[in-house]
Amino acid sequence: MTGFGARLAAAKAQRGPLCVGIDPHPELLRAWDLPTTADGLAAFCDICVEAFAGFAVVKPQVAFFEAYGAAGFAVLERTIAALRSAGVLVLADAKRGDIGTTMAAYAAAWAGDSPLAADAVTASPYLGFGSLRPLLEAAAAHDRGVFVLAATSNPEGATVQRAAFDGRTVAQLVVDQAAVVNRSTNPAGPGYVGVVVGATVLQPPDLSALGGPVLVPGLGVQGGRPEALAGLGGAEPGQLLPAVAREVLRAGPDVAELRGAADRMLDAVAYLDV
């Protein structure tokens, strides 16, 4: 078995350093002349799978699938399976976080043998980084990755993430604890525990010792500029995984237009893996 960090590095080397989001917001479905139903959701995802099958990582935003109940989860399962069949690494943007047996249940769903389990999942550390242990253990056992929220782009996040404890910001504590896991499980790197740092964060945490990947959402519509990402938080070359969704998705529903928009963003961030 090959660890997630190595699989991600290989995918980026072969397909480029970009994560493309599937965010089936109702407004986008309407813009694509699709009904805001589970059938419309399925059609939206089918188009996205065809357009993004050649990229390294695709990130479905789980909340937009949950909104359709069981039918939405069924679409998500099929979408994950189709992307993985095309050789794409799938990052489920679920932002799960809890404690004890509940966290263990989330771990089984998103990092175990469940049909929902993707190659990686996002997680929230608000209940304490240690509460993520069941998820981290399940991910390690199944060669999956975990991206833990550290410093997000939304302005509300700063009140918590930049609060200080023991001389470090909360965001830095999250990064440092992720680094401990990576050093203990794969000291030679790359590790399987990454963090999320928004592209528009003005004071990012120090990422130089993380030893794992950094998901950087917020390019394009949200204000993040590809040319401004180099050296984010002291990250090493190849460590960053920029993510884009709406900037690309608004080019749909034509598959070629979607692929072209994603290719242009990939060209803009390709320098990060040089």
From Swiss-Prot:
The keyword Cell division belongs to this UniProt entry's keyword annotation: no
Top-level EC class as recorded in UniProt: lyase
UniProt superkingdom: Bacteria
Active site positions, chain numbering: K95
One Gene Ontology molecular-function label: orotidine-5'-phosphate decarboxylase activity
EC number in record: 4.1.1.23
CDD domains attached to this UniProt entry: OMP_decarboxylase_like (cd04725)
A single BP term in Gene Ontology: 'de novo' pyrimidine nucleobase biosynthetic process
Family statement: Belongs to the OMP decarboxylase family. Type 2 subfamily.
Name listed for the protein in its UniProt record: Orotidine 5'-phosphate decarboxylase
Species per Swiss-Prot/TrEMBL record: Mycobacterium avium (strain 104)
Gene that encodes the chain: pyrF
